[in-house]
Amino acid sequence: MYFAYGSNMNLDQMAMRCPGAVLGQIVCLPDWQYFINGNGYAGIEKKEGSKVLGCLWTLKEKHWRALDHYEGVAGGYYERVEMEVGLLGQNTFAKVWVYLSCNYQYGIPQPRYQIAVVEGARQVQLPVDYLPILESWVNGCPD
């Protein structure tokens, strides 16, 4: 299972990158926060008391190869690591794979990138009270 918290929540993007991938449940990663990295793409970092919401995808091996390519794993932009997330509204946890940014500098999103993230969050029906966190990054780091 893959935990998407950025633009890979966007159904149109995932249909293009990973045709046949199956959308799963909404999940929460406690004590982490969302940010836009210095390259202009989504990242997450540890922060006690915060949370990152996203969705799960069931992927086949060909999908993993495609995502590793798109996420720039070979170039050192992201690394794929295993983490534990909580299923939203349940006291159940699952081990999943997630891409972590190797760039922890805050930055300005690439053109239309954060809009695609927010659209994806709406498409997968993240809770509406989480959307302002994503929307706050549309023009760069919120103060």
Feature map (PLM): residue ranges:
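Glycine-aromatic micro-motifs
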Residues: 1-143
